[in-house]
A protein has these predicted regions:
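A generic, residue-level signal for flexible/boundary positions that often mark functional hotspots
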Residues: 13-15, 58
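Function-determining sites in protein domains
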Residues: 25-178
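Repetitive helical segments and hydrophobic/amphipathic motifs
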Residues: 15-16, 88
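Bacterial N-terminal signal peptides that target proteins for export
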Residues: 1-11
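C-terminal motif of bacterial Sec signal peptides marking the signal peptidase cleavage site
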Residues: 19-23
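Short, functionally important structural connectors and interaction interfaces within domains
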Residues: 11-13, 34
């Protein structure tokens, strides 16, 4: 019984460190990934977001440059980072069945033509950022896009596992753009 009590105290002590050490949180997990700098630039305001786009399918986009909606989107993404448990390897295709939606954050102006699958490629201007956020149930894929081909972004991607309580925050983000 004494050993069980010691183990419980040890686990509680270790868990309390994760609450106070930033390296245990979702933000630190994201910052240590290949998209970390771009995430900070776009989600935490080091760069001005010019456009947010949301789609719940692959062919349509709801684009806005409204400052309030951009602020709402970046606030929700900051809340979502709190739900990041860990970075994961690219999951197998069966993990992508619960598609919830896809967001784009851009720090440059464009004619939005790349939202159409029939469009030509859009190369991201040097020094600019386009981040895509794909939500699949408890998986978040973030891509720092260098080139858009039709409706698909080509670039560096990171895959994150979200905790079970993340779904409400993701739904709030989606609701902002419906």
């Amino acid at each position: 019984m004494k050993n069980l009590f010691k183990k419980i105290l040890l686990v509680a002590f270790a868990a309390s460190f994760c609450l106070v050490l930033p390296s245990c949180g979702g933000k630190a997990v994201i910052e240590n990934s290949v998209i970390g700098q771009s995430w900070n630039d776009m989600v935490h305001g080091d760069k001005a977001v010019m456009l947010v786009s949301y789609t719940d399918g692959f062919m349509s986009g709801n684009n806005t440059s409204d400052k309030d909606k951009i602020t709402s989107a970046t606030d929700c993404l900051q809340n979502i980072e709190k739900h990041v448990v860990k970075e994961i390897e690219k999951p197998d295709d069966s993990s992508f069945s619960e598609f919830m939606g896809k967001f784009y954050l851009l720090d440059f102006e464009t004619d939005y033509s790349f939202w159409s699958a029939s469009s030509s490629a859009l190369e991201i201007p040097e020094g600019n950022t386009l981040l895509t956020f794909w939500f699949y149930g408890d998986i978040l894929i973030v891509t720092d896009v260098q080139l858009v081909l039709g409706d698909y972004g080509v670039g560096k991607s990171a895959y994150f596992k979200l905790d079970k309580s993340a779904q409400k925050t993701v739904e709030n983000l989606i609701e902002t753009f419906k």
